[in-house]
């Protein structure tokens, strides 16, 4: 799940979450500084003025369960780190911190699928939105032809 509707200091950076159980309506999210990554209800996503539901393209769908398993084991309950990937290796088997887009990226990177569309040191929500490995399932408040120009 992605939204374009999050801003800090005038920068529209968005927010990302990894759906860990569609049936239970559960996500794993890195919320903000000072808060460890935690499980949330998908109900909160109904309040965003924009959202994008993306999933791996058919040839990569089997990686979703592997990504969730990695996230449950390694990415839940870790500190928020706005600069994850800058001063440390971008991918770590046992990360010391993460931010929202990095959490989703790291879960899939553990399966060998690199969702970072520009390959930079920092993974952003825009990078995920523009990943060649993801299909759009549903959008609200976003042009499906131009997810995030």
Model segments located where?
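Glycine-rich catalytic cores of cysteine/serine-nucleophile enzymes that process amide/ester linkages
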Residues: 1-59, 83-95
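Secretory-pathway/luminal and periplasmic proteins that interact with or process carbohydrate-rich
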Residues: 10, 77-80, 113-114
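Short, surface-exposed linear patches
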Residues: 23-25, 49-51, 76, 104, ...
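Acidic, low-complexity intrinsically disordered regions
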Residues: 41-44, 76, 144
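Long, low-complexity intrinsically disordered regions
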Residues: 52-109
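Activation targets extended, charge/polar-rich intrinsically disordered C-terminal tails
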Residues: 91-149
């Amino acid at each position: 799940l992605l939204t374009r509707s999050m801003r800090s200091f005038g920068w529209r950076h968005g927010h990302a979450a990894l759906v860990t159980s569609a049936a239970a309506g559960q996500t794993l999210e890195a919320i903000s500084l000072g808060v460890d990554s935690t499980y949330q209800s998908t109900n909160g996503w109904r309040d965003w003025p924009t959202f994008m539901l993306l999933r791996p393209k058919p040839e990569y769908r089997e990686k979703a369960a592997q990504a969730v398993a990695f996230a449950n084991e390694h990415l839940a309950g870790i500190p928020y780190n706005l600069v994850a990937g800058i001063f440390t290796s971008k991918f770590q088997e046992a990360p010391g911190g993460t931010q929202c887009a990095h959490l989703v990226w790291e879960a899939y990177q553990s399966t060998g699928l690199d969702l970072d569309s520009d390959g930079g040191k920092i993974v952003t929500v825009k990078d995920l939105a523009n990943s060649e490995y993801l299909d759009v399932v549903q959008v609200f408040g976003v042009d499906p032809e131009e997810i995030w120009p």
